Amino acid sequence: RVDYLRVIIMELARIADHLICNSIVGVDSGAYSGFLYLMQFRELIYEIYEEVCGSRLTTNIGRIGGFERNFTNTAFEKLEKFIKEYPAVLKEFENLFNRNRIFMDRTIGCGPISAERALNYGFTGPNLRAAGVDYDVRVHTPYSSYEDFQFDIPVGTTGDCYDRFLVRNQEMWQSLSIIEQAFKKVQEFKGAEADVYHADVPEYYLPDK
């Protein structure tokens, strides 16, 4: 259960990152509307974080062995609202940009990075995958129960600004799917198991004398 909650927190962070990156690419390309479409959901993610741990940006709920506290019912309600409402807005955002001729003219061929150069420079994440490298640590070296989830790895071809934009968009869909799966798995825990948020270990150890 704790691993699934960790995955939810991490994938919300991925979406929060990608939506700000892609909406700002739109602003820099002369299209402000997309920024307004997505930022309201970045705010909703921060509201979830605030409900979970009291912090909007730095999720300080994590501890060795679990969390500092359990998720509240309000946090789950806000999460469910995000899962239900975000897909429609993300789809609208894609309709605004993905095949927009002006946006494509301003991003295709801009700042291309080859797969070889991306590896040599130590690129990771969507920038690496946009360059055509099919690698995601969540799949190739799974941690925190990622092996329990079904999702794809979006990969680009040219590593230009447009590819990076598309990969991030596709990753948001994959993250949304992971969050949905994790939310369903968390709901399967009943009774006392539904209250587990930390390993059964002492809060601290005293050193040997």
Question: What residue spans do the PLM features occupy?
Answer:
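Metal/cofactor-centered catalytic core regions of large enzymes
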Residues: 1-209
